[in-house]
Amino acid sequence: MTDLIPLEQAHCLPRKGSDHKLGEARLAELLPQVPGWELAEAGMALTRTFRFADYYHTLAFVNALAWIAHREDHHPDLGVHYDRVVVRYSTHDVGGLSENDFICAAKTARLYDQGITA
């Protein structure tokens, strides 16, 4: 689906059932497209830690990320700390990772890279 356009420009689609769970080959194709992200939990989740100067910038990022999650209707698990946010994506309805996780990971990284919260 997202091979024709960059992940950060794609939009999430409803995904339910194990048919949409990504296999190892597809994970290996998509992971290089989201630098800095790591597979976690035996390939069941995608995680990355984002660092900030202070709590204000941390929360500004979280609020901007909440807008992306709402727009895409795909919501990460967040660990919010004073100077960092741990973002974890997984698609519960497929029992692992779907393309939606990689789309949102790319959008999250773009938000951070643009320095919107700086």
Curated annotation (Swiss-Prot):
GO molecular function list: 4-alpha-hydroxytetrahydrobiopterin dehydratase activity
Gene3D superfamilies per record: Transcriptional coactivator/pterin dehydratase
Coiled-coil region list: none
Top-level taxon of the source organism: Bacteria
Catalytic reactions of this protein: (4aS,6R)-4a-hydroxy-L-erythro-5,6,7,8-tetrahydrobiopterin = (6R)-L-erythro-6,7-dihydrobiopterin + H2O
A Pfam family recorded for this sequence: Pterin_4a
Keyword tags: Lyase
InterPro entries associated with the record: PCD_sf, Pterin_deHydtase
Any single biological process term in GO: tetrahydrobiopterin biosynthetic process
EC number(s) from the headed UniProt entry: 4.2.1.96
Entry similarity comment: Belongs to the pterin-4-alpha-carbinolamine dehydratase family.
HAMAP family noted in UniProt: Pterin_4_alpha
PANTHER family linked: PTERIN-4-ALPHA-CARBINOLAMINE DEHYDRATASE
Name of the protein in question: Putative pterin-4-alpha-carbinolamine dehydratase
Organism: Xanthomonas oryzae pv. oryzae (strain KACC10331 / KXO85)
Lineage: Bacteria, Pseudomonadati, Pseudomonadota, Gammaproteobacteria, Lysobacterales
